[in-house]
Amino acid sequence: MNAGKLILGFSVALAACGSGNKTEKETLPSVDDYQEVAIFNGDSAYMHVAAQVEMGPRVPGSVGHARCLDYITGTFRRYGADTVVEQAFTAEAHTGEVLGLTNVVARYNAAAPRRILIGAHWDTRPWGDMDETREGRSTPIPGANDGGSGVGVILEIARVLQHMPPAIGVDLVLFDGEDYGRSSSWSNDEETWCLGSQYWKSNNGYGGKDARPDYAVVLDMVGGKGARFHREVSSDIHASEVVDRVWDMARSSGYGDTFVNSAGGHIIDDHLSINRAGIPAIVVIESLNQKTNSFNPTWHTHQDDLSAIDRKSLKAVGQTMVNLIYEEGGQAAKQ
């Protein structure tokens, strides 16, 4: 894996060599004049996506699902998380199946009085209900973008946090069971989706000495080719200041063309449960694709494979999140 580099600003003391009659002394910047620079590596995030796809679909109860859980928790531990919690539980799906699910919570700077949350879902759709073929509509999808991309970005964020510890707390939360919902009637079947975050809402452990996050950002389908992210409707309704903060950071980071400052779709996603837990939450998601006027064309199809992933999209989202983390902590990371 090309794990990328953390580049640190530094100053070098120079000895002035010259004649004794030199009247002006060169003024050199001190160490304090330089800022640490945290680089999010899009190639590294891409390799995390590729690793997930290689495991096969990550449908709850499958071999790929079990392998991915080990991969996620092992990566968080390798990247120095203060704590890694596997929140195992069961939930009944709309199919009548009882699913064994696991949310994963990795905490960085866990003792900090302030924190933010960045989340994604790590499961994949059990069937390609938007696929063109009958077989595809009844078999699990690869889930490179829908499932894999958010995880890839978050795991690369974890690597950055290991090498440049944040001044604020950062909770990285991967939800299970997001994509097991009934698609026949979106508005009436909201409760069949986002099973992991629904459970987490009542079992998140915030309270007592643990600080509740100031806000949360959920990343979903953030790796599509040429992806552009519009302001999701419910995010603007419940947490418009957070949307402003993220979109402003994207613009100042050079990704204003990727984060479009206009309204997108109204999406059922894990941010809804987080908002109901009393934490202002938004979702970054491609919801106005230029070809479909909706989600990415590969959504819930077997074309959602590694060829659908764009390193530039991963980089834009990941670097924006990294810059946001250090800006919140007063560390002023730059690209």
Identify what each model region corresponds to.
Residues A51-A111:
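A non-catalytic alpha/beta surface segment that caps or lines the substrate-entry region
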Residues L14-A16:
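C-terminal motif of bacterial Sec signal peptides marking the signal peptidase cleavage site
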Residues K22-L69, Y79, N293-A308:
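N-terminal capping segment at the start of a domain
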Residues V31-I39, V53-V63, A91-A93, R137-G147, ...:
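Second-shell loop/turn segments in exported
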Residues R58-P60, T90-A93, A110-A112, W122-P126, ...:
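Solvent-exposed loop/turn segments at secondary-structure junctions
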Residues Y215, V222-Q335:
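Active-site-adjacent substrate-binding region
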Residues N2-G9:
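Sec-dependent signal peptide recognition
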Residues S138-E241, H266, H271:
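Acidic/histidine-rich catalytic neighborhood of metal-dependent amide-processing enzymes
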